[in-house]
A protein has these predicted regions:
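N-terminal pre-P-loop "Q-motif" helix
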Residues: 22-26
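S-adenosylmethionine/decaboxylated-SAM
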Residues: 2-18, 28, 35-116
Length: 116
């Protein structure tokens, strides 16, 4: 597992754009501002789980002790009753981004971090 983690991390740093780094820094700066404020974190739309896991890690690093409440349908966007433009957007979104994380995979990742 450790070797796999190193390989994944190395691939990320070798291939990530400055936009990806900026997003991580932006999320960190936001989390620092809220770390000491009372309350919990709500993630509305988990998608692939990246920002959720980023915030979970920031929570550990900054010892914020926040609770995370996450919502998602863990499935594809529905095409039922959508306009032509919405359907076009959804199809392009699927093609560009792929599928989101399924709930069982997310639960496994959270369990490794001892999060329910």
């Amino acid at each position: 597992m450790k070797k796999e983690m190193w390989e994944i991390e190395n691939k990320y740093f070798l291939n990530a754009t400055s936009q990806r780094f900026a997003k991580t820094i932006f999320h960190y700066e936001i989390f620092k501002k809220i770390a000491k404020i009372k309350g919990d974190i709500f993630e509305l739309g988990v998608f692939k789980g990246n920002s959720l896991m980023r915030f979970v890690n920031f929570n550990e690093v900054l010892k914020a002790k926040k609770k995370f409440i996450c919502f998602d349908d863990f499935g594809d966007f529905s095409m039922t009753g959508k306009s032509k433009d919405d359907k076009k957007f959804i199809l392009n979104w699927r093609k560009t981004t792929g599928k989101g994380i399924n709930i069982n995979s997310l639960k496994k990742k959270l369990k490794k971090k001892e999060i329910k």
